[in-house]
């Protein structure tokens, strides 16, 4: 056990899908996994283990933002020996290259958070995903006929009051969307010699002001869940 996860050692499989929302974790477990079992519930941050097409896989919530995400990622790696961590979440698009319902594979993550500078002795850390996981995601998307969008994301500490005047600059540097965790996830996995990747489904477009309905959000997220489970199976 850890201060934030009350699962037993051995409850987590080496591969784990991460979601910010613990209710989404429960949804995935009930809809997509066989023999799903709740293994942790501290602070109502739920975790499950089960089978997908006969292969063991775990699910874990991580809350919102880099600080919360890195707590869970650190404990999963150091205490529960999780080797591959795949975050699946939503994001707000800032580039004309992507639209609503698109799935983005974050090949790099910039951030306005200071956490990686503290971690890397005030130098700029290149927060990037594991290549092998990225390749598997790309190849699986091709097999499933999913037009996976590939590019950078910006992990912000702010959900509200973000610097909207910076959107054009970010898009110029091939940043496709804004989310809140990838930079911390990648840095933690790099530090602890584990594999991580972030996939994000576009739920809102911050430039065009388009947004998915609640029903559309579920449907588009299901496509990403299937992609994530297939690439891990």
From Swiss-Prot:
Active site: 204 (proton donor)
Highest taxon in the source lineage: Bacteria
Presence of keyword Transferase: yes
A molecular function GO annotation: purine-nucleoside phosphorylase activity
UniProt-listed Pfam families: PNP_UDP_1
Gene Ontology biological process terms in this record: purine nucleoside catabolic process
Site-annotated residues for Important for catalytic activity: 217
This enzyme's EC code(s): 2.4.2.1
Family the entry assigns: Belongs to the PNP/UDP phosphorylase family.
UniProt-recorded name of the protein: Purine nucleoside phosphorylase DeoD-type
Organism, as annotated: Helicobacter pylori (strain P12)
């Amino acid at each position: 056990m850890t201060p934030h996860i009350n699962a037993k050692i051995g409850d987590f499989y080496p591969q784990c899908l991460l979601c910010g929302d613990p209710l989404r974790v429960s949804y995935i477990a009930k809809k997509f996994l066989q023999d799903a079992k709740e293994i942790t519930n501290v602070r109502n941050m739920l975790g499950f283990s089960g089978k997908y097409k006969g292969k063991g896989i775990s699910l874990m919530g991580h809350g919102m933002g880099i600080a919360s995400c890195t707590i869970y990622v650190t404990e999963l790696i150091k205490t529960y020996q999780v080797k591959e961590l795949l975050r699946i979440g939503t994001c707000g698009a800032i580039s004309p290259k992507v639209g609503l319902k698109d799935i983005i594979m974050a090949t790099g993550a910039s951030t306005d958070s200071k956490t990686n500078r503290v971690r890397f002795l005030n130098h700029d850390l290149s927060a990037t995903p594991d290549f092998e996981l990225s390749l598997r995601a790309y190849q699986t998307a091709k097999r499933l006929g999913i037009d996976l969008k590939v590019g950078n994301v910006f992990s912000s500490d702010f959900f509200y009051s973000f610097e909207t005047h910076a959107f054009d600059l970010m898009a110029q540097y091939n940043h496709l969307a804004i989310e809140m965790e990838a930079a911390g996830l990648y840095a933690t996995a790099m530090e602890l010699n584990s594999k991580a990747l972030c996939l994000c489904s576009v739920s809102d477009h911050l430039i065009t002001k388009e947004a998915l309905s609640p029903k559309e959000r579920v449907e588009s997220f299901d496509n990403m869940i299937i992609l994530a489970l297939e690439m891990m199976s």
